[in-house]
Amino acid sequence: MIYKKIKSLTNYFIKTLGIIFLLIILIFFFGSSTSLRINFLSEYALDNLKKFVRLKPDYNSFQVNNISEFSEVYKEWFLSFFNSKNDFPKVEILTNFNNLIKLENQRSRKVDDSFVKARIKIYQQDNNDNKIIKVKVRSKGDRNIHRINHKLMSLKVDVRGEDRFFGLEEFSIQDPIVRNYTWEILLHKLAKKENLIGLEIFPINLIKNGEKIGIFFVEEGFTNELLEKNNRKEGPIIGLDENASMLNFPNLYYDFYSEKKLLNKMPGTYKIAKNKLYELKNNYKNNNFNINDYFNIDDWAKLFALTDLLTTYHGTVPKSVKFYYNVNTGLFEPIIFDGHKGGDNYQKFIFLDLVNSVNTNNQECGFVCQHKEWFNIFFDKKNVNFLNKYLFYLEKFSSENYIKEINSIIIKDLNHINKSLYANLAPSDGVFYKGFLPYHFDLNHLTERAKLINNKIH
């Protein structure tokens, strides 16, 4: 017991020294004037120093960037020693030893990611009548950050039987950093606000076989429940076959979710949707091609305008965005997925630049320009109706009133999550690694994006 207390106090002392050291650095780099910093370091040297300590460039900065933000984060960390913990659901994944070995082999990519049986316990607040759900789980994620170790690995979960996990049949459990924390939650809340199909994403306190892991996020899968909650009729949901070698349009292969069920229940609809995808890939360059015959252009215009505001461009590339085939309209609607704000340099870019042929090199538009064939289907000057809708939503989403509405959502739904993340000194998202400084959510990024959009459309 004495050893544990000494160890705890030592760790606290080391962290405190680290805080003081970082405060000194931040005061110099972010609190002092630019001219003062240049007297000591050239901008080139300063940029290299930022890279060395894994600070992302300013356009991508979702870590603490000034004394005020630093104080906000470390205040929550300090108060966490005295305040009660968060009220997120407590969830435990229970797996036997043999299946733990299988999951570990999946994590290290020694075997295919096949499902193994497990159970999930949902703890009740009074510790009575805890709910046990039978599930099957497997590892998931392309980037190594999904597979750092067994404790932090991302999991795909399917419920076995008729039970549901907070209303979900299929979902993922993953470290919040893999989607840049609450930015992804905000994206989906705004999507649903605009009557687009958005996923449920919420925090839990995760335990694995008795070991407390920490705050993880649950992300909804692609099922009929998703469609019902978003007021859509049952219909095909389509992604990409990521096992194929090509993921660039049109050299890609589409993959239907729950394909066997779909073939048994809606064979005619399945065939129509599949044929339409084939026509899209083969006819998109024809002079008589019309996007109105394939896409709900109002929904896609909303998606692209919202993406410009949030810089969640990763969610619009073919690998990420999912299609829902609406059986009533015969058109494809977007399902937002994996927006992952902060994945590349979009400091000056919006989709409108594709029409005007500006900022279309990889230094300005990141991996968007690696998928020009896909985006040019929409951002072609002949698509007058689509472009008018897109400009309308750009105007709406970049307005002062809309930014105020977003701020209300942040205060109501995200602030308490962010405070819990600050209390744990959650590291900033470096996309492929954990950042040097703690994560911080900054609304100013959206106000700056709104200014950029307004300057481009007026």
PLM segments and residue spans:
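Regulatory N- and C-terminal appendages and interdomain linkers associated
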Residues: 2-132, 402-458
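Surface-exposed patches in mature extracellular/periplasmic domains of secreted proteins
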Residues: 170, 198-207, 290-294, 321, ...
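Internal "kinase-insert"/substrate-recognition segments embedded within catalytic cores
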Residues: 195-199, 211-302
